[in-house]
Amino acid sequence: MSGGVIRGPAGSNDCRIYVGNLPPDIRTKDVEDVFYKYGAIRDIDLKNRRGGPPFAFVEFEDPRDAEDAVYARDGYDYDGYRLRVEFPRSGRGMGRGGFGGGGGGGGGGGGGGGGAPRGRYGPPSRRSEYRVIVSGLPPSGSWQDLKDHMREAGDVCYADVFRDGTGVVEFVRKEDMTYAVRKLDNTKFRSHEGETAYIRVKVDGPRSPSYGRSRSRSRSRSRSRSRSNNRSRSYSPRRSRGSPQYSPRHSRSRSRS
């Protein structure tokens, strides 16, 4: 297999992530399928080292999407290979150096060389006053599930969920918040585990009781999810309002999510 490159303009290290411990037969399109749902991709550089597992660099348009991808995909089981996903160690204050280790195949860990601290990457940190409260979420609904669902209304800059089945979502623009209440209230929500529920969406008041509660499932990163469960996740790509989206092709028979 030869590595493939999808080229785009250069960007910040905050937008670029390292993906290690890939299977030997991985293709650029396969890497794309794993990461496209987290945001617009600018560049995928897939490399195949002689005597070692392939690795790739994926560059997003938005650094918040890169954080989402690291949080959600580090440790992800891909055809028996546990992916190692982190920011390049020359960026984000990690110092300079190579990527030690890389892990073995067949579910071996991505050990060696360290990496970003576990649990560092939670919901995106950018905040907005254009906030809605969502209620009626199923127990397995995560902040990423909620963010994906609400992207149907526009650009989401923050999302989180709480133990009582409520969540908070913040939009970049006021009109997106208004559209979300009008179009997504009482719609069917589907979690990454396939649980469905009809949710209610309303504009957050100045003293919302749900905002700021302690989190539980929003921060947990499950490493035991099956690929079939991940395939069931319903993703809605962000509406294009600026730069063109990186448009994946989904004609392969082995579609991975």
Swiss-Prot record:
Pfam families: RRM_1 (PF00076). GO terms for molecular function: mRNA binding. GO terms for biological process: alternative mRNA splicing, via spliceosome. GO terms for cellular component: nuclear speck. Residues 15-90, 130-204 form the RRM domain. Residues 214-241 have a biased composition (Basic residues). The keyword Nucleus applies. Residues 94-126, 202-257 are annotated as: Disordered. Residues 94-117 have a biased composition (Gly residues). The keyword Secreted does not apply. May play a role in preventing exon skipping, ensuring the accuracy of splicing and regulating alternative splicing. This is Serine/arginine-rich splicing factor 1A. The lineage of its organism: Eukaryota, Metazoa, Chordata, Craniata, Vertebrata. The gene is srsf1a.
